A protein has these predicted regions:
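ABC transporter nucleotide-binding domains
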Residues: 2, 9-191
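A structural detector for beta-sheet-dominated domains
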Residues: 5, 25, 220-222, 249-251, ...
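Short, flexible helix/strand-to-coil boundary loops that buttress conserved ligand/catalytic motifs
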Residues: 68, 190, 211-214, 261, ...
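ABC transporter nucleotide-binding domain
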Residues: 163-250
């Protein structure tokens, strides 16, 4: 288990992480939050690339700075380093100086892609680089894998292959902590979500419970209530008008819905489905309001 206690990280006067307490256990944990929420900073602190001003990080009970703890963590950054003249073979050799790898597993993952074995990595597209470095990360023999913007640049076919390989690693007992703006992919992979907002923990929930108390309605009123009027009648999360139709999301409450209907009798109202991307976005909006109100 990775245990984080009272973690604070500042950049000049900007507080990137603010007294963060968190435990990361087995399985796949998704890390989400708006830009600037502190996701990359958190991953880099766990990996030992950044040092916090306050707080502690323990890896299976060992302080993060000791060798035994460092050897259990592989960090895949959003733009990993590669020598200018590096090829697939040379980059494997370079990273093998720092980590223990399973070469057969590395080639097994690479077999899903069409990367030129002798091509220079500097000439690879963003997606090709991502395929290579994900293969490298997944073939490392560390217990913990940290992945920053893991799916950025991957085409749908490569993304499906990578998802399958990540699930294999989970089945083999690895703990994976992954950030991504690709919420729909992350929602299908993650066992739980950690959500940051302005450096603070906004949510730490099992995937199936994240935002499940939200309901979305599509309605047509003779006179649309304003956002402020709706907010006075329910725990409003989102409000949007499309022409004469009003879409709004509220925390589930049959009593509040009846209050809305009584105050503004609708000509038409129906509950509509919330997809994974919107669900996480709504949870982020709600968490930000709760933290900073």
């Amino acid at each position: 288990m990775i245990k984080i206690s009272n973690l604070t990280k500042r950049f000049d006067k900007t507080v990137a992480l603010d007294r963060l307490y968190l435990e990361i256990g087995d399985g796949i944990t998704g890390l989400v939050g708006e830009n600037g929420a502190g996701k990359s900073t958190l991953l880099r602190c766990i990996a030992g690339i950044l040092n916090p001003e306050e707080g502690e990080i323990f890896i299976d009970g060992k302080p993060r700075g000791v060798l035994e703890a460092k050897q259990e963590i592989y960090f895949l950054s959003d733009y990993p380093y590669s020598p200018k003249a590096g090829t697939i073979d040379s980059i494997y050799g370079f990273y093998s100086c720092f980590y223990d790898f399973d070469l057969d597993r590395f080639h097994e993952i690479l077999s899903h892609f069409s990367l030129p074995p002798k091509g220079k990595i500097v000439d690879f597209s963003k997606g090709m680089r991502r395929q290579l470095f994900i293969a490298l990360a997944l073939s490392s023999r560390t217990k913990y894998l940290l992945m920053d913007e893991a799916f950025d640049g991957l085409d749908p076919i490569a993304l499906d292959e990578i998802k399958g390989e990540i699930l294999k690693e989970k089945e083999n007992g690895r703990s994976i902590f992954v950030s991504s703006h690709n919420i729909s992919t992350l929602e299908r992979l993650a066992d739980r979500f950690v959500m940051l907002s302005k450096g603070r923990l906004a949510e730490n929930a099992e995937t199936q419970s994240l935002g499940r108390n939200f309901v979305k309605y599509q309605a047509y009123f003779e006179t649309n209530p304003t956002e402020e009027q709706l907010r006075s009648l329910c725990n409003l999360v989102s409000y949007r008008k499309v022409g004469s139709v009003l879409n709004f999301v509220m925390e589930e409450s049959a009593e509040d819905l009846e209050k809305i209907k009584a105050a503004f009798p609708p000509k038409f109202i129906e509950q509509v489905e919330i997809d994974a991307d919107e669900l996480v976005t709504l949870a982020m909006i709600k968490a930000r309001k709760d933290l900073h109100q």
